[in-house]
Amino acid sequence: MKITEVKLLVLEDPSSKGRGGHSITRVEGLRRIQYTHQGRPNQELRPVRQSFLEVHTDEGIVGRSDTSMTPYQADIVRYHAVGRSPWEREGLFQQFWKGTRWVYQPPGWFGAFDNCLWDILGKAAGLPVYALVGRVRPRLPAYLTGGDTDIEGYLSAIETGKEMGIGAYKFHTYKGGKADIPIYRAVRDAVGPDYELITDPVCSYDLREAIEVGRVLEELDFVWLEEPMHEQKMNQYQELCRALTISVMGTEMLMHDIDLTAQWLIQGATDRLRGNARHGTTQVLKLAHLAELHGANIELNAGGALDGLVHAHLGCCIDNTDFYEFFGATADSLRQTGAQWGLLNAPLIEEGHIAPPDGPGWGAEWDEEKFSSLIVEEH
């Protein structure tokens, strides 16, 4: 089997419009200058777009993944991949990983291509990807997460999650350390000792605040403290990890870079790794195995590719991971999002868990007529 074509398809949904992007805004009430993000309410509404990569073979098997790849990046992949066998997945990974510097691209740039190869290999074998890798669990528990809010807002979100059977919640908060402590205490008191709580202050703490808050989180039995400071400060994360017993998780803004992410774990600057299959399934699995040998976890960021399908597979294949990160308001939120582009079977949250389909490859089922009707560019 040989690769014959690599296509970058840009789809546009004329029935859905958005402003997209973020603006930078200052956090009020802090002595230091601290920023966060918000939307762009004055920006013109535009039709929503999404790109997909397709890898075609001479046996008629096609791998598909959503992507943020540029036409130039797709052309690099096309130049090197056409004529190669998709069974050379590891060799192609090594070539693009080691060659990243020489084509002047950011780390992880070819992740969608890697995902397409896994899709092809599963379809050729007649097996779901979870069977190719080796399944360790039939389904993965989810935690619900959302935006910055107040005590009532967090408790309301937790109740929404409970209605879906979800037993864990992750805060996002940009208020600064001292403002967060009474919120964490109040929510823990409200939900009781057995509900799982996690927090992600999104770089809104300094080191002193992170240590102070971290000790409170230990008292309140939180699962982990995520990205409390800007991740470029490795020495501060090393000090934080030494000071706390709660798991500290950095590397969300570094997770596209397999080498930097590995070094953070090796150098004791994080207790858990962050990963996202947007940067490739092979990369995620390599990081998971590295973490496993260090007695650490990898936690997957958001849905990955194909509206949760890819992370549903990987979460059921990786022993050292705890949760699927879910942002939805209803149990079928992922399915609704996928349906916009013709994906019919994005996973549901059922009894607080997510599970992959049993079809070959990623098991994605498509309304091909709808998918094709939305294509506005092909590269």
Question: Positions of the model-derived regions?
Answer:
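Metal-dependent enolase-superfamily TIM-barrel catalytic cores that perform enediolate-based chemistry
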Residues: A131-E239, A243-L244
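Structured beta-strand/loop patches that form or line metal/cofactor-binding pockets in enzymes
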Residues: M1-E59, L334-R335, Q340
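Extended hydrophobic packing segments that form well-structured cores
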Residues: P360-H379
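Shared catalytic-loop signature of beta/alpha-barrel
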Residues: R32, E90, R215, D221, ...
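Metal- or metallocofactor-binding catalytic centers and their adjacent structured scaffolds
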Residues: H56-A124
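Ligand-binding pocket scaffold of soluble enzyme catalytic domains
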Residues: D58-R64, A124-L127, L132, L290, ...
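Conserved, mostly hydrophobic/aromatic
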Residues: I3, G60, F113, G126, ...
